[in-house]
Amino acid sequence: MMRQKVRIPSILSALFFALCGLMSLYLTYKTAGNLLDSDASSELVLARLLADTNQILSRDWFYSTELRVLNTQLIYMPLFKIFSDWKLVRFFGALLLQAILVLSYYFLSRQAGFSRNVFFLTGGLLLLPASTPYARIVLLHSYYVPH
């Protein structure tokens, strides 16, 4: 007996993607001002220093754990030029980095020949805060997006 493929309507996969995006947006908004993590906060401190000195690289910064030259500060630094509120910078920076993550995955999925339906289903999973470590490391702190 042959198994039939289950076809999910495109509207359902797009709806799933939108729902996951909204969940990530809500989580990012609720936690943007409450992340007390030295590594994540040091990225914002560096970005603020770069914004205040109008530089992309700084000679006055000593990295605590690793050398991060082209990283999240390239997103956060221009946001400090717009907003003075650190919570807003973290919120919009995380959203921009999540958008970059999804757009880069969209490019990969199209190059791999995936349908848009598959992209919406799997791209939604990228934005889904399925566990605390994934939500903190990837979605909120955006550690692996620039890599």
Q: Where are these predicted regions, by residue range?
A:
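Start-transfer (signal-anchor) and selected internal transmembrane alpha helices
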Residues: M1-S24, F114-F120
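Helix-to-loop transition at the C-terminal end of transmembrane segments
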Residues: L22-S41, Y134-R136
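Membrane-proximal lumenal/periplasmic loop motifs of glycosylation machinery
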Residues: K30-S38, D52-M77, K87-L88
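Membrane-interface micro-motifs in multi-pass membrane enzymes
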Residues: L36, V69, R116-H147
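Extracytosolic (periplasmic/ER-lumenal) interhelical loops and adjacent juxtamembrane/interface segments
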Residues: L44-L49
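Membrane-embedded alpha-helical segments of multi-pass membrane proteins
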Residues: L67-L74, F92-I100, S142-H147
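Membrane-interface starts of transmembrane alpha-helices
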Residues: I82-G93, N117-L121
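Transmembrane-helix motifs of polytopic, lipid-linked glycan transferases
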Residues: F92-N117
